[in-house]
């Protein structure tokens, strides 16, 4: 008799101990239910009935032709970067360096130097150590230079850098601060100002991606700065190699669309190459990188043990085995030492989404998928006998995971989250089923119709909801689980993820058997060329980001906590980076980033 239960593995334990600065905001949650407790009788791990051991007759099935994981279970479990005496020594030195850097932030220096220091700390992933100090410095700079819409400084570099950092930290800075850099007619930026200072043009480019709906000045800034920077790169006229490298990096994706932690090694190496680097900050960056890497390895090992014990990769060989990739996404959503629980929850959800997506996209017949969807709607264990063996395994893994997670939240927060967790999966699999029906019938939807379903099937709802309800101060459980479509931040982050995914994976997925993606739908609607269609999808991503920026600036009505909202937005950021080089699960350069982040310490 086959048993699918994740209760044997304490996935949600927090491995961090020691100083309060590194203590989790959550209590130590474990997925392991005590067998003798009343809770274990209420939410029992489900087992596949013995009468289902006979597997169905063989039939022709599609195959995703997925390659095996680059990092198997044994490799992940062999990671050993967590020596207590070494960590104690590292933490002590880290605390000393933090004190010294705080003194740097408190030193009276030029405002532009203060901004550059803060920008370095953010890019190097250190700003969470200095939140109060950074807020104090930025408040002073805002009051002295940016509160008045009439820019009295006249320095494009300072204005653009300050504008970006202030908007990142929630200050209300008007786009009119850039009006003094426009031509006499005020219709565009003064090209003589833009062309003469490459560093200032780069800062204007980065600032322009914080534009909101209706901010035409920032739209102009984005257009003209992009044109000039691309021209400089094409001509090879940038003599500073470090600056040239940074510009190429930014033209691929601006800072506002990136997640620092996913590229921590790139930013560290870029800082190391600078002649003006601060040795204290450089040492702290390397030290913190190694401490975080040790924590990430422990979390990754826990997630890997849970996945291995589920045995889905063994029993369902058609599903992708992508533990490291799924954890990489989780690191993008929640950075910092306080959110290990959320990272592990998200990694497990990503793994389940990947497996269930393969059931719908690759292996299941349409009749089986309809049965599977109906069982998930019912959310019981009495209906599973009608499912084929492989679907029983998949369903019970999902059912047990959701039940265990809900139990732990109930135990810790005293709230029942099953209705929200369950409905998040119902929404997703119903969208999966609609796409399967389209594929089976050969139906080609319009772009609008496609996105109405594909923005749900991309899986943002079951990603964000468990993260949000696990946050201690969240009140989301008081809302109806049937209102997810009303939340702009969920919808917009899903659109960025879907469109970025389609740019990275569309051709491969259509070739292996899937519904037309955004690119193909636009071609069908407009008779555009493929390059024109891809350019339109890139334009759509930019427009969605305007709406996202607006929604985050007007977050008083947001149903999510600040942490939950940022996690939702970070889904889009992670997607744009991960799909920049390919499909996010395949052979592309993204794997090198994972290697550098998780397996290679800084020396």
From Swiss-Prot:
Database matches in InterPro entries: Isoprenoid_synthase_dom_sf (IPR008949), Terpene_cyclase-like_1_C (IPR034741), Terpene_cyclase_plant_C1 (IPR044814), Terpene_synth_N (IPR001906), Terpene_synth_N_sf (IPR036965), Terpene_synthase-like (IPR050148), Terpene_synthase_metal-bd (IPR005630), Terpenoid_cyclase/PrenylTrfase (IPR008930)
Q: Which cofactor does it need?
A: Mn(2+); Mg(2+)
* Domains (record comment): The Asp-Asp-Xaa-Xaa-Asp/Glu (DDXXD/E) motif is important for the catalytic activity, presumably through binding to Mg(2+).
What does this protein's UniProt record list under function?
A: Involved in the biosynthesis of phenolic monoterpenes natural products. Monoterpene synthase which catalyzes the conversion of geranyl diphosphate (GPP) to sabinene hydrate, mainly (Z)-sabinene hydrate and to a lower extent (E)-sabinene hydrate, and the formation of minor amounts and traces of several other monoterpenes (e.g. mainly alpha-thujene, alpha-pinene and myrcene).
Do you know which Gene3D superfamilies this protein is assigned to?
Farnesyl Diphosphate Synthase, Terpene synthase, N-terminal domain
Q: How does it assemble?
A: Homodimer.
Q: How is the cofactor bound?
A: Binds 3 Mg(2+) or Mn(2+) ions per subunit.
EC assignment: 4.2.3.11
Location of region: Homodimerization: 363-369, 435-472
- In the record, what terms sit under GO molecular function? magnesium ion binding; protein homodimerization activity; sabinene-hydrate synthase activity; terpene synthase activity
Tell me its family: Belongs to the terpene synthase family.
Q: Which gene encodes it?
A: TPS6
Catalysed reaction(s) here are: (2E)-geranyl diphosphate + H2O = sabinene hydrate + diphosphate
Note the Pfam families from the entry: Terpene_synth, Terpene_synth_C
According to UniProt, the name of this protein is Sabinene hydrate synthase, chloroplastic
Q: Where in the cell is it found?
A: Plastid, Chloroplast
Q: Where is this motif: DDXXD motif?
A: 357-361
Q: Which PANTHER family match?
A: OS04G0344100 PROTEIN-RELATED, TERPENE SYNTHASE 10
* UniProt source species: Thymus vulgaris
Q: Where does Mn(2+) 1 bind?
A: 357, 361
The transit peptide segment here is 1-47
Domain of life (superkingdom): Eukaryota
